[in-house]
Amino acid sequence: MKKSTKLLAGIVTLASAMTLAACQSTNDNTSVITMKGDTISVSDFYNETKNTEISQRAMLNLVVSRVFEDQYGKKVSKKKTEEAYNKSAEQYGASFSAALAQSGLTTDTYKRQIRSAMLVEYAVKEAAKKELTDADYKKAYESYTPEMTTQVITLDNEETAKAILGEVKAEGADFAAIAKEKTTAADKKVDYKFDSGDTKLPADVIKAASGLKEGDISEVVSVLDPATYQNKFYIVKVTKKAEKASDWKKYKKRLKEIVLAEKTQNIDFQNKVIAKALDKANVKIKDQAFANILAQYANTDKKASKANTSKSDQKTSSDSSKDSQSSKSKSEK
């Protein structure tokens, strides 16, 4: 049931955003609560809660959601939103409804949260495509390992994993047979094919496999399962490894996918794209209680400006130094 407590990071803020939106669309004097001798109005509730951290984040989410729906809404179909929702529901299985309820969400509010995330993801990916250079491809190629055929044992206990490692490394051991017998993977799957940029297994497992030669067996790889907050332990054997071509262009399509994935996951790059969208939308904050909710995006522009200014100052300083040296040389002559 631990899985149900981690539906998505920050998911509650969207539900709060909907509450704030409802408050703002209702008459300020509308009573929310009545009691003997007093009432609590929408305005009372709004003023009491707007300065809290969760309300600040909720308003930010609401602004970003509205801006990206306006600018990119036609780029992500409702069908794709439904597919993403269904996939999430499938992953949580029977605990999905409980997870939604515990997070204060309904089916509709969760779908809106998913859609907002998909719109931002689309915008970030499109921006990343425009910045792709040969240097990006070459850098990705340096750390790229082509397709590997592997056998993977998944275990829940470190002591057991270490014991099984001894078994599979023993002379004459049948790794595949031991893997099929011992793995605790839900689907009992042990055979995998992937390259170094794949995500079908944890990154540390793929990294360990990438560093192995054909026929080698890894040490025990410990990975924290984000769904259960429990460690899982992996043992990998590489049974076949494709030889890496000397020309990066052979992998251009795959390298593009890897570079774009890295860029879209980069927080600074995400903030840069969001900042540009907010600027285009001409967002104006009317209530000073929310004056700083966009600060992280304003800082993105300032950092870029500062970096450009620094480069400009360095160039000016360098040019001045050259001029000074030139003048000195002429004077000496």
Swiss-Prot record:
Subcellular location, in the record's words? Cell membrane
This entry's Enzyme Commission designation comes to 5.2.1.8
> Per its UniProt entry, which superkingdom is the organism in?
Bacteria
Positions with an attached lipid (S-diacylglycerol cysteine) read: C23
Q: What is its main location?
A: membrane
The signal peptide, as residue positions, is: 1-22
Any one cellular component term from GO for this entry?
Answer: plasma membrane
The catalysed reaction is: [protein]-peptidylproline (omega=180) = [protein]-peptidylproline (omega=0)
All copies of domain PpiC, residue ranges: 145-240
Instruction: Locate the compositionally biased regions of type Basic and acidic residues.
Output: 312-322
Keywords linked to the UniProt accession: Cell membrane, Isomerase, Lipoprotein, Membrane, Palmitate, Rotamase, Signal
InterPro entries registered for this protein in UniProt: Foldase_PrsA, PPIase_dom_sf, PPIase_PpiC, PrsA_foldase, Trigger_fact/SurA_dom_sf
Which PANTHER family did the record assign? FOLDASE PROTEIN PRSA, PEPTIDYLPROLYL ISOMERASE
Q: What does this protein do?
A: Plays a major role in protein secretion by helping the post-translocational extracellular folding of several secreted proteins.
Record's family? Belongs to the PrsA family.
- State what protein this is by name: Foldase protein PrsA
Task: Provide the species name.
Answer: Streptococcus equi subsp. zooepidemicus (strain MGCS10565)
